[in-house]
From Swiss-Prot:
It comes from the Bacteria. Gene3D superfamilies: Histidine kinase-like ATPase, C-terminal domain. GO terms for biological process: cellular response to phosphate starvation; response to antibiotic. The keyword rRNA-binding does not apply. It comes from Staphylococcus aureus (strain Newman). GO terms for molecular function: ATP binding; phosphoprotein phosphatase activity; phosphorelay sensor kinase activity. This is Sensor protein kinase GraS. Keywords: Antibiotic resistance, ATP-binding, Cell membrane, Kinase, Membrane, Nucleotide-binding, Transferase, Transmembrane, Transmembrane helix, Two-component regulatory system, Virulence. SUPFAM superfamilies: ATPase domain of HSP90 chaperone/DNA topoisomerase II/histidine kinase, Homodimeric domain of signal transducing histidine kinase. It is found in: Cell membrane. The chain crosses the membrane at residues 15-35, 43-63. One of its GO terms (cellular component) is plasma membrane.
Amino acid sequence: MNNLKWVAYFLKSRMNWIFWILFLNFLMLGISLIDYDFPIDSLFYIVSLNLSLTMIFLLLTYFKEVKLYKHFDKDKEIEEIKHKDLAETPFQRHTVDYLYRQISAHKEKVVEQQLQLNMHEQTITEFVHDIKTPVTAMKLLIDQEKNQERKQALLYEWSRINSMLDTQLYITRLESQRKDMYFDYVSLKRMVIDEIQLTRHISQVKGIGFDVDFKVDDYVYTDIKWCRMIIRQILSNALKYSENFNIEIGTELNDQHVSLYIKDYGRGISKKDMPRIFERGFTSTANRNETTSSGMGLYLVNSVKDQLGIHLQVTSTVGKGTTVRLIFPLQNEIVERMSEVTNLSF
């Protein structure tokens, strides 16, 4: 079937030749009908010989010219085609040389842009780490504040700044996340409690408590740093859009897969917004005056979940709240996924 495709392509590209040769042969036949002295047997012999030689010529040309395009069809690198001299005709060599020059130029640009991106990532990473020092010092100063009301307000704003810095750091590291992952068995409960501790100043100001219920063995095979980032972003959203309600957090076991659910009783997500919640920079269309949301939290979660093998489910009702469920993979599923990624990279 594949050979028929190449034959069809070849005949289509040589159709003008074929029509011209047929025209010349029919022209000779037409002349023979006018000139009665022209021996008809000789003419048929000439036409038959001409068509036979044309068929042989087309076959030889087909096998010679289609070879290069079959290499293209197999996705061979242009460097291999050029260095192995797989182009047969002068036009093919010229085409291969042109493609080689263009692809080489584009590769140089890609390398240059990648270096710039790496420098940009390094600059932002260094900036975030540098600014963390005065932010940490600020926390020590806030802890010395004796006015509890003022202290609580300052801790609330400090927590927001610290969270935004962490988010920016993770956004910067998105491109290199594969190199930055280390899988091991870790406790979901421990990760959740650590993240709750980080948000306690915000939850206290907003009158939000946490109902934590871990019913099953909560150890999962994942990368602790990136998994905590996902939990942090989901908790941040739950806190951001809730007030004076408890957030329910717990684990369940379905088909040997541990799942973590985080349920809030906040404003909820409308049906028209639901398909777009993972888009970069998207914020709710229901509250256009909302200035505290950057639209990056769920984008980050969506960008990382596949690398961790996590299946994400979001259900929501406007005015009643949102439930986010993280379904964790088994260890062998992670190993299989990493093997596939490694094979693709080669």
